[in-house]
Regions:
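Detector for the c-type heme attachment site
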Residues: 55-59
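Sec-dependent N-terminal signal peptides
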Residues: 4-19
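N-terminal "domain-start" segment that seeds a small globular fold
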Residues: 18-34
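C-terminal partner/receptor-binding element of secreted or periplasmic proteins
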Residues: 157-177
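Short active-site neighborhood of thiol/selenol oxidoreductases, capturing the structured segment around
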Residues: 38-52, 77
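Short, solvent-exposed mixed-charge patches
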Residues: 181-184
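Thioredoxin-like thiol-disulfide oxidoreductase module
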Residues: 28-33, 65-135, 143, 148-159
Length: 184
């Protein structure tokens, strides 16, 4: 009986550890420094504080333990507030926060550069190990839509085949209830 209780407790503790997996977000400067030491792809979440869909990504897709585990193993994950007033140095260039003539906060120059001037929130920038942008993906992505996209880039499948061919044979690691959220 004691063995059963111990086994049950260990199982519950391991499940809660898996459920607590979170994405290790960092600044773009930190990701750049780490990429030099240990090359890895970079995933940049470009968001704003007022964006409802950005908050939903944080609470659903990014909170999914399967997504978080994969992101932590294959990417340096960056959060970039598109309206920060901070000066950010990236790839040897300084980008300053933009303040409009009326004194209100504008869009940060790095966010504008990364999104090619197409400001939409949330948007995600996938960069290779050389810190070159491969893809900009705009809009909210539920777990079911996000998972194959991160595998397509994280497993470097994009080098070998089209996304259409990849999606045809992709096998999800998400549980059916985790993948049930429909794209909005």
């Amino acid at each position: 009986m004691k063995k059963l209780i111990v086994i049950t407790l260990l199982a519950m503790m391991s499940m809660s550890a898996i459920a607590q997996e979170k994405i290790n977000w960092m600044s773009i400067e930190e990701a750049e420094a780490r990429c030099v030491e240990e090359p890895r792809m970079i995933f940049i979440d470009v968001y704003t504080d007022w964006c409802g869909w950005c908050k939903r990504m944080d609470k659903s897709t990014f909170a999914n333990p399967v997504i978080a585990k994969y992101m932590n193993e294959h990417f340096y994950a960056v959060k970039l507030n598109a309206e920060t007033s901070d000066t950010i140095t990236f790839q040897g260039q300084q980008y300053v926060g933009y303040v409009r003539e009326d004194g209100r906060q504008g869009t940060h120059r790095l966010a504008r550069t990364l999104l090619n001037g197409r400001m939409s929130y949330p948007s995600y920038v996938i960069m290779n190990e050389e810190m070159r942008a491969l893809q900009v993906i705009p809009g909210y992505q539920n777990e079911k839509a996000f998972e194959p996209m991160m595998h397509f880039f994280g497993d470097k499948v994009y080098l070998e085949m089209s996304s259409e061919d990849f999606l045809r044979d992709f096998k999800s690691e998400l549980e059916p209830e985790e993948a049930s959220d429909q794209k909005q």
